[in-house]
Every structure is written in C-alpha cells, then in structure tokens.
Amino acid sequence: KPHASYDIIMHFFVLEHISNPVSFLREQLKLLKSGGKIIFEIPNAADPLYSVYDIQGFERFYWSIAHPWYFSEDSLRYLLDQLDCSYEVLLDQRYDLSNHMIWARDGKPGGMEFFTDKLSIELENGYKQALINTGKCDTLIGIISKN
C-alpha cells in the first residue's frame, strides 16, 4: 500500500499520455502528505496555431495517437472536479510570436526568438499575454492540493 510521504509530485507533458488520468491522479494523491501538491503541465487543446491560425502543418504535427487525451481549460477542470480536492488551473504561453510566424510561413517549428530582435521583447510579451488572456495559449498548468 502506498505510503503518504511526498510534499510535491511534478510531471510535465505526461498526463495526456495516460489512458486513465483520473485514476493516475488519485494514485498520486495517495502518495502525498496532507497539504501536499501535484503540479503538472500539459498542452492546451486550444493552442493558437490550431484554434486561431488553423495552420495545417501544425495540425499534422500536434494531433498524435500517443495522446489518448487532449485537454482544454474546461475539460481539465471537469477532470479535476472528480478528485475531491482543491485545485488551480493556470494558463501559459511557452512559444513566442516569432515561432508562430515561422509556423505560418514555413509550416514547421523552429522560430523561437527568430524575429524578437527585429520586433521587441515588449511585443513578444504582449502577444503571449493576449493569448493567455483569451485562453488561446499553448499550455495548461494544474496545481492540485491534498486536503
């Protein structure tokens, strides 16, 4: 039987690969001390390259049989509501405007910071914040707290 001995469990871009994410997270909760946290990061199904720009090359790149699950902010909240614990869902944008411009131009990745010196860091940061504010960002972060 698992012993509750951990303060924090972290995983990055794992949950979308798990066939039963609710059971997976429940098993992790058993490993946490009271007040412990599970922190995880997953891709957002509302990634702007798909949901805003509809870049065909990105769609072929993004949708993978290796991912039995794709989560939006709402579907992640629905999943976490099944755990009987408190949680937060945070939104983040990992890839910048330059990367999105290269995807639009070339139909493939590889543009991180490519145009930043020609544009500005303020534009890059503003772009990322606008995507986060609209929920059309590329990353979701879950923070689950064991009661």
Question: Which residues fall in each region the model found?
Answer:
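Short linear motifs at secondary-structure transitions and domain/linker junctions
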Residues: 14, 44-47, 61-62, 114-122
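Residue-level detector of flexible, active-site-proximal loop/helix-junction positions
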Residues: 46, 59, 75, 94-97
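Generic structural "secondary-structure junction" signal
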Residues: 51, 63-65, 99
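Short glycine/proline- and charge-enriched loop/turn segments
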Residues: 54-63, 103-111
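Soluble, non-transmembrane catalytic domains of enzymes that act on hydrophobic metabolites at membranes
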Residues: 57-64, 70, 82, 88-93
